């Protein structure tokens, strides 16, 4: 077990950025392996859910290769890990109360002491993520075109560039591609790719060590700043304040800022209006879920990278049944390859059906009101219980109305039946919600995009 985890950790450390590895993989702990089932523990629910959605496929693939057989990887919650991994606080530094992140995850902020290292090493850019390796389709062609324009003219075109969309659609790939091209054109340029969570940690570290002068000196001196998943800034006032200063300094100096988020800027919960207005001052582009032809192209390209041949029929079958995002396609491909190698079979549609039977059964499930409520709640980051509660703040009322609209559009339920499933509400309340969201969809591109993403997710 220990040998496996060392192998798995080493592999992931090579593939991920230092921030990703430190934030998501390092806190995990392998528990046991028995009868083809591997159990891995996470210290809290947030990390557990994130690891399951982002890294489960890769860990499963590494495990299958290590044991030379299909492995069922299960992630479990073990809060004891959080307390076990907290460092002892130095007597000379008092613990700091912060609503940003706990002090136990602090990492050193970058300093000028590392300026002798190569620019690419400091940038945290993944060299594998380039424009050449990015599969383009209707869903992302505008985002790619904007990214290329920015890469060719950093600081003068679309500043800031704000890319938003669901998980696994290629936003991170695009911003790394920009960084790679800018570095290729000018190796001396000062670039930093950073996940929003790591930026939060840098702010806390500066606060703890009274090092905001060094913090500002570093971030304000960049030529290109790439911030991934900025929705993590929501509700963190000191982080937002410092980022606002950095934003203003970089824009004034005609330096380029590129930002990604899982949602449209105005929909980010807990984000300062000043920042939202700054985000809107540049170019905001949606990255949509890939269409069928694009999904096929992605599968065929990934298969070539894995050194296997995928027939068009097999690629179309997989792409037709798995529609949500690129990461899901990559995970499915790994499962197919592991199954094919273990059983010594060529990759046919029948083999794919066997390898992906669990995934396909989930995709083929009927849409229910309960599933709509859960999907919408996850999308807007609220509790499912809020769907049938009496709460009426805007951040709850609107998602509830959207869920009612989707229930009317995607199920056979009557208005009274839908109302009953939303906390016993009257059918006129449901009718009002349906009409309101339908009207908003016709007038607002943002609303139409939200509904499109939700419908694609629900239909699988």
Curated annotation (Swiss-Prot):
Purpose of the protein: Plays an essential role in the initiation and regulation of chromosomal replication. ATP-DnaA binds to the origin of replication (oriC) to initiate formation of the DNA replication initiation complex once per cell cycle. Binds the DnaA box (a 9 base pair repeat at the origin) and separates the double-stranded (ds)DNA. Forms a right-handed helical filament on oriC DNA; dsDNA binds to the exterior of the filament while single-stranded (ss)DNA is stabiized in the filament's interior.
Superkingdom of source: Bacteria
Subcellular location: Cytoplasm
Entry protein name: Chromosomal replication initiator protein DnaA
Similarity comment text for this entry: Belongs to the DnaA family.
Region (Domain II): 78-123
Matches recorded under NCBIfam families: DnaA
């Amino acid at each position: 077990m220990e040998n496996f985890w060392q192998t798995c950790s080493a592999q992931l450390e090579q593939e991920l950025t230092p921030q990703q590895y430190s934030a998501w993989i390092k806190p995990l702990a392998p528990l046991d392996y028995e009868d083809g089932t591997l159990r891995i523990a996470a210290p809290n629910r947030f990390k557990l859910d994130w690891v399951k959605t982002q890294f489960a496929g890769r860990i499963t693939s590494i495990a299958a290769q290590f044991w030379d057989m299909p492995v069922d990887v299960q992630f479990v919650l073990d809060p004891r890990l959080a307390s076990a991994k907290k460092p002892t606080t130095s007597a000379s530094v008092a613990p700091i109360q912060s609503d940003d992140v706990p002090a136990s995850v602090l990492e050193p902020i970058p300093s000028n002491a590392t300026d002798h290292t190569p620019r690419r090493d400091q940038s945290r850019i993944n060299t594998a993520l380039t424009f050449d390796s990015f599969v383009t389709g209707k869903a992302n062609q505008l985002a790619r075109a904007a990214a290329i324009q920015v890469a060719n003219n950093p600081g003068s075109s679309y500043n800031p560039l704000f890319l938003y969309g669901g998980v696994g659609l290629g936003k991170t790939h695009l911003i790394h591609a920009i960084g790679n091209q800018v570095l290729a054109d000018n190796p001396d340029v000062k670039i930093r790719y950073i996940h929003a969570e790591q930026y939060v940690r840098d702010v806390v570290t500066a606060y703890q060590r009274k090092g905001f002068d060094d913090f500002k000196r570093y971030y304000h001196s960049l030529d290109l700043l790439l911030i991934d998943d900025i929705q993590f800034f929501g509700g963190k006032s000191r982080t937002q304040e410092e980022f606002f200063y950095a934003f203003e300094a970089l824009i004034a100096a005609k330096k380029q800022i590129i930002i990604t988020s899982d949602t449209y800027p105005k929909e980010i919960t807990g984000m300062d209006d000043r920042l939202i207005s700054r985000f809107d001052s540049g170019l905001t582009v949606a990255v949509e879920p890939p269409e069928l032809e694009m999904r096929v192209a992605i599968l065929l390209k990934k298969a070539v990278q894995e050194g296997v041949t995928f027939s068009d029929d097999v690629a179309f079958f997989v792409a037709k049944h798995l529609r949500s995002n690129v990461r899901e396609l990559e995970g499915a491909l790994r499962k197919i390859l592991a199954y094919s190698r273990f059983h010594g079979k060529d990759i046919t549609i029948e083999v794919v059906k066997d390898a992906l039977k669990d995934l396909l059964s989930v995709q083929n499930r009927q849409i229910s009101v309960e599933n709509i409520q859960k999907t919408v709640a996850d999308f807007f980051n609220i509790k499912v219980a809020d769907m049938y509660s009496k709460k009426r703040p805007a951040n709850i009322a609107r998602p509830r109305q959207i869920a009612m609209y989707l229930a009317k559009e995607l199920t056979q339920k009557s208005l009274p039946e839908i109302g009953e499933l939303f906390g016993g509400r009257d059918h006129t309340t449901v009718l009002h919600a349906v009409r309101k969201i339908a009207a908003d969809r016709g007038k607002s591109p943002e609303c139409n995009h939200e509904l499109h993403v939700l419908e694609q997710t629900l239909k699988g």
